[in-house]
């Protein structure tokens, strides 16, 4: 078993192998079957199963990735009820057709003799009322037919049940469900045939059946038809048992199917038992440049199922992501001090006071603003303008201010005139003012130069560092892209090596969202699933800082709780499932008067397309007879047995025996009544009628004139004698007396040719003639 497991692991899609080597599946199969490496005839063996796509077919059929309402039709296709009814109908027809009419008639005669229901016995009992005898006879035939029918059907049901148990077993017998799965997925059915089963194995099965059933020797002794029925049942059981044991439909998940590209030969191998089997091809696959294309329903439905599942999972992710109560859009402007001095100026104004009065009263604000203006210079000539503006704004009042010295004050040694004279000289140029301005200009230029040099150096260093980081990031991004490309190429090569080209059709698993499918978030509790999602999906945080400039800002934000319309996709997929399965397998939709679907059933075409090849091509069962009809496939077991019994030869035999038996009972009652009725009637005086007819008394009383019984003259005499004794028509009696011939009449015809009241008179027998009783003695008896 361990070797089988390792063998199966080596066959698993060639994982971990190099793309340049041959597929590991083919290498392993060549070890088992050396003929794969010889006699290629210019072709090569291609792996068509298992691949990711073919295994996906089976998963979709089981409803693993997605399930839609139309998918349920496949359950009706896969149902085994029709196969069971086919086995039951075949066994019943085959066994009942073995009943011989002679055996059935002998059993019927033995039955009526044992019960005392022979026609003579019933006439002896019920001759006064023949209708009662007929009713008793009808009841007897119906009772015996009912008991015989139930006995036969019970035996047939046991045989069919034993055959069905053998067909549905798991130990090497063929399974109809696996057959339908292969047919739907690939259109190819791998079958392992064991050859002809030995007779001893079939005999053991028959012995087990005899031990399990109640059709014992005592029943065979009571019924003459029992041996023939038993023999037919055992033969049918042995035939079906050999068919079921000789063929085995392989399991889908442990089978390898390969095809030769030149000869299109198909071979199948069991990965556990290493057995080789053949393939029953219902629809031929096609080999193309992109791989194997199957002519099957799943080949046409697979892509649509994956698309619908992707939309469904997208909707689920959107539902989980939009479950968060708050979604925030965050954005900010980047702090670019060196690149945008105007922004720094605004920040300084905001920090020191944006009002004009506050700016004029703060010397620090004026100085910082002067430095910023120096940084914003675009050419060297702007230095003079900036300095002059700063001096006019801050230094002008201090320099232009004239110190008025009053010489008339104490300590100055002057008078008022001198003061006025001094005041009168204010309009003249002030030499100290130019000197102070020159000194301040030089000092400011020196300090501004140092500050500007430092700022420019810092900006240059930042630009260099930024360029280096940008270059390094670009190099890393390029390496990452190249690595991803190489990984994708290796993965594609490995997939092509595994499936030998067919993987180009293989789509990735639809449920592999966020790298791996996690059952915790798939359809579980909403809050728990939401917590298991990545933070990038649930936070809904959008950062636009890198995309915004000085002139851009967030004017508004819109949060869309979008959920894809997956219901439309599901409806479309459901309709696609229905159309594909109904049309491919010719299924029949049963509806009520309102047009609502009641059930999906097999039609006659479906039975011919699916059930027929299963018995004829897979099981090679040749004694099944006609296929069961669609109206019989869905009847109950009892209704099916009743319906088939009415169509069998046994029912026709029983009807024939019933008709004959009832006729015999009526005839026996009529004869018995003819013989007994004269003893119940009073004698009549008919002498006057004789005289009117002109018949002499010697004709009436002459016993010696009576002819001997047995000749035609005696028949005429009997008729005339009956007519004379019972007052029959004189004219007819005269014609008989004259000897007119009315033809040779049998006993029944004679009785029918005269009136009913003539038929009840007995005539002298041979013993009466010998004893001398004659007609006179008969009249005395009457």
UniProtKB/Swiss-Prot annotation:
It is found in: Virion; Host nucleus. Coiled coil: none annotated. Its main location: virion. Pfam families: Herpes_UL6 (PF01763). Residues 735-782 are annotated as: Disordered. Residues 448-469 are annotated as: Putative leucine zipper motif. Transmembrane segments: none annotated. InterPro entries: Herpes_Portal. Residues 735-752 have a biased composition (Basic and acidic residues). GO terms for cellular component: host cell nucleus; virion component. Keywords: Disulfide bond, Host nucleus, Viral genome packaging, Viral release from host cell, Virion. Residues 772-782 have a biased composition (Basic residues). HAMAP family: HSV_PORTL. Forms a portal in the viral capsid through which viral DNA is translocated during DNA packaging. Assembles as a dodecamer at a single fivefold axe of the T=16 icosahedric capsid. Binds to the molecular motor that translocates the viral DNA, termed terminase. Belongs to the herpesviridae portal protein family. Homododecamerizes. Interacts with terminase subunits TRM1 and TRM3. This is Portal protein. It comes from Psittacid herpesvirus 1 (isolate Amazon parrot/-/97-0001/1997) (PsHV-1). The gene is UL6.
């Amino acid at each position: 078993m361990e070797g089988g497991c390792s063998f199966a692991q080596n066959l698993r899609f060639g994982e971990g192998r190099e793309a340049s080597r041959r597929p590991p599946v083919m290498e392993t199969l060549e070890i088992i079957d050396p003929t794969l490496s010889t006699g290629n005839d210019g072709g090569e063996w291609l792996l068509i199963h298992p691949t990711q796509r073919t295994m996906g077919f089976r998963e979709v059929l089981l409803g693993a990735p997605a399930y839609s309402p139309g998918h349920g039709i496949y359950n009706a296709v896969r149902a085994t009820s029709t196969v069971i009814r086919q086995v039951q109908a075949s066994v019943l027809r085959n066994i009942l057709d073995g009943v011989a009419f002679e055996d059935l008639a002998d059993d019927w005669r033995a039955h009526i003799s044992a019960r005392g229901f022979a026609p003579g016995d019933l006439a002896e009992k019920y001759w006064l009322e023949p209708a009662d005898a007929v009713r008793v006879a009808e009841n007897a035939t119906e009772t015996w037919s009912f008991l015989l029918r139930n006995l036969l059907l019970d035996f047939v049901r046991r045989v069919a049940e034993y055959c069905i148990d053998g067909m549905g077993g798991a130990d090497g017998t063929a399974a109809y469900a696996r057959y339908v799965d292969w047919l739907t997925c690939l259109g190819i059915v791998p079958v392992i045939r064991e050859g002809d089963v030995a007779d001893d194995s079939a005999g053991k099965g028959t012995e087990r059946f005899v031990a399990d059933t109640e059709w014992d020797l005592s029943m065979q002794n009571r019924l003459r038809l029992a041996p023939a029925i038993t023999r037919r049942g055992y033969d049918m059981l042995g035939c079906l048992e050999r068919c079921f044991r000789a063929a085995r439909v392989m399991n889908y998940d442990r089978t390898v199917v390969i095809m030769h590209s030149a000869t299109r030969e198909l071979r199948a191998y069991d990965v556990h038992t290493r057995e080789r089997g053949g393939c029953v091809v219902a629809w031929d696959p096609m080999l193309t440049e992109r791989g194997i294309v199957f002519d099957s329903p799943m080949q046409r439905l697979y892509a649509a199922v994956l698309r619908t599942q992707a939309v469904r999972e997208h909707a689920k992710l959107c539902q989980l992501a939009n479950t968060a109560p708050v979604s925030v859009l965050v954005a900010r402007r980047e702090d670019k001090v060196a690149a945008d001095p105007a922004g720094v100026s605004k920040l300084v104004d905001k920090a020191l006071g944006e009002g004009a009065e506050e700016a004029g009263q703060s010397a620090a604000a004026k100085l910082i603003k002067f430095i910023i203006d120096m940084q914003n210079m675009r050419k060297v000539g702007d230095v003079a303008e900036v300095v002059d503006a700063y001096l006019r704004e801050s230094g002008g009042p201090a320099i232009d201010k004239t110190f008025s010295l009053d010489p008339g004050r104490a300590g100055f040694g002057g008078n008022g005139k001198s003061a006025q004279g001094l005041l009168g000289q204010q309009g003249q140029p002030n030499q100290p003012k130019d000197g102070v301005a020159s000194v301040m200009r030089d000092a400011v230029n020196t300090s501004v130069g140092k500050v500007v040099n430092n700022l420019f150096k810092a900006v240059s260093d930042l630009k260099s560092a930024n360029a280096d980081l940008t270059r390094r990031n670009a190099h890393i991004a390029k390496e990452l892209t190249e690595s991803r490309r190489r990984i994708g190429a290796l993965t594609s090569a490995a997939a092509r090596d595994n499936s030998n080209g067919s993987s180009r059709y293989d789509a990735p698993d639809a449920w592999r969202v966020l790298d791996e499918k996690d059952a915790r978030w798939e359809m579980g509790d909403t809050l728990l699933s939401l917590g298991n999602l990545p933070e990038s999906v649930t936070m809904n945080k959008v950062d636009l800082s890198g995309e915004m400039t000085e002139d851009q800002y967030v004017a508004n934000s819109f949060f869309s709780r979008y959920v894809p319309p997956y219901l439309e996709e599901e409806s479309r997929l459901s309709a696609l499932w229905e159309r594909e399965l109904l049309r491919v397998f010719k299924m029949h939709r049963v509806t009520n008067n309102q047009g609502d679907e009641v059930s999906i059933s097999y039609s006659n075409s479906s039975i011919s397309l699916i059930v027929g090849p299963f018995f004829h091509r897979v099981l090679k069962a040749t004694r099944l007879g006609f296929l069961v009809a669609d109206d019989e496939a869905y009847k109950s077991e009892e209704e099916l047995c009743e319906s088939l019994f009415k169509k069998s030869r046994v029912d026709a035999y029983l009807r024939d025996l019933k008709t004959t038996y009832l006729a015999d009972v009526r005839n026996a009652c009529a004869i018995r009544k003819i013989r007994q009725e004269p003893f119940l009637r009073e004698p009549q005086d008919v002498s006057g009628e004789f005289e009117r007819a002109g018949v002499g008394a010697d004709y009436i009383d002459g016993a010696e004139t009576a002819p001997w019984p047995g000749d035609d003259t005696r028949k005429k005499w009997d008729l005339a004698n009956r007519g004379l004794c019972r007052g029959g028509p004189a004219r007819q009696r005269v014609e008989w007396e004259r000897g007119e011939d009315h033809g040779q009449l049998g006993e029944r015809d004679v009785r029918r040719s005269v009136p009913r009241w003539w038929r009840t008179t007995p005539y002298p027998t041979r013993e009466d003639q010998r004893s001398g009783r004659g007609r006179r003695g008969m009249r005395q008896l009457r």
